[in-house]
Amino acid sequence: MNTEQLEGRYQTVCAAPSGNGFRIGHMPDFLMRSDINDCAPHVHAFYEILWFQQGEGIHTVDFTDYEVKPGTIFFLTPGQIHHFDDKERYHGVSIKMCTDFMRDEKDPGSLSLKYDIFHAFDAPPYYIIDADTAVTLGRIVEAME
């Protein structure tokens, strides 16, 4: 089912990042300012990394519920249906990337990111990182901002 087929069934968010191809937001700020209801199933046309640093609950992706706890990182692709159970209790980072940002398939690192992480058919759409990795990732996100 592609994004156009989802029109009318789920709220569609197509505002892809522009400029340098990615945008970083922080939870709960971007969730509270959002023009959509993130607690309702929705779909968008960009890649998104959701890093949950604090809070616990459920994040539903493609009709499957996944437990959220600190250190959980979701990798969402265009067209995936997802929603949060309660957006006010989460703190973390959202990195949104337009499809052009992920288009480079000449670099082995880009291929791995795109197909081993975002489009992995044999693994759930998330990873859980430990505290040391979270510190390193926090520095990387800071540098990206």
Where is each model-derived feature located?
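Residues immediately flanking
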Residues: Q54, P78, M97-T99
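A hydrophobic/aromatic-rich effector-binding and dimerization subdomain
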Residues: N2-G21, D85-E145
